[in-house]
């Protein structure tokens, strides 16, 4: 396992991790995590992929986990797309020939889908979009939606509680419990990232 840094277009340092099998990897899986979580929540996926001879790269999104930036915020949505591009270029430099599979879960799935729509690249052999955040699973109070829209234009870094119902994360109660107790998990979102 190796840790690495990614320098963003606006000067932030994002924290990443590479885990590779002992032999030359069959493929590279690049994981983009969901909103509020971080790369260390994907160790079960990493372990399964390593057992299959697949190298795995992960990173903490800006404002998440151990990466720099205001918690739960991106100054511009386009920065998230640029961050994924830098992340993929890092993985490609590590392994020149292995096919890259780009995976995004939840908000990460949202970012990956937009990356694929906005960027032209021959680097990605396949994509996995797991339970993408296409819209909120609940309807927030109307005043919060109006406030978020106003604040997104005036002060995009304004934050409020995300109101995520952790009991809906998994049918396994221990998953929700671990999420709730994880000090690197966020429970706030900024107006600039509000959908």
Range-by-range predicted roles:
Residues 1-23:
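N-terminal cap/lid segment of alpha/beta-hydrolase-fold proteins
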Residues 26, 53-54, 97-99:
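Short coil/turn segments at beta-strand junctions that form active-site/ligand-binding loops
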Residues 36-38, 65-95, 99:
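Catalytic nucleophile-loop/oxyanion-hole region of alpha/beta-hydrolase
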Residues 39, 46-70:
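Conserved alpha/beta-hydrolase
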């Amino acid at each position: 396992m190796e840790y690495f840094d990614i320098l963003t277009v606006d000067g932030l340092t994002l924290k990443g991790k590479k885990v590779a099998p002992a032999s030359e990897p069959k493929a590279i899986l690049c994981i983009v995590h969901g909103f509020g979580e971080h790369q260390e929540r994907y160790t079960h996926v990493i372990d399964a992929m390593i057992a299959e001879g697949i190298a795995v790269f992960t990173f903490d999104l800006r404002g998440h986990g151990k990466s720099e930036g205001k918690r739960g915020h991106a100054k511009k949505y386009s920065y998230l797309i640029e961050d994924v591009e830098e992340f993929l270029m890092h993985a490609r430099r590590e392994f020149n020939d292995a096919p890259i599979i780009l995976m995004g879960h939840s908000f990460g799935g949202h970012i990956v889908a937009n990356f694929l729509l906005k960027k032209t690249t021959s680097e990605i052999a396949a994509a996995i979009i797991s339970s993408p955040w296409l819209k909120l699973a609940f309807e927030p109070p109307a005043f919060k939606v109006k406030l978020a829209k106003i604040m997104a234009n005036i002060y995009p870094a304004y934050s409020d509680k995300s109101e995520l119902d952790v009991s809906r994360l998994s049918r396994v109660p221990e998953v929700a419990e671990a999420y709730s107790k994880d000090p690197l998990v966020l429970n706030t979102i900024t107006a600039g990232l509000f959908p």
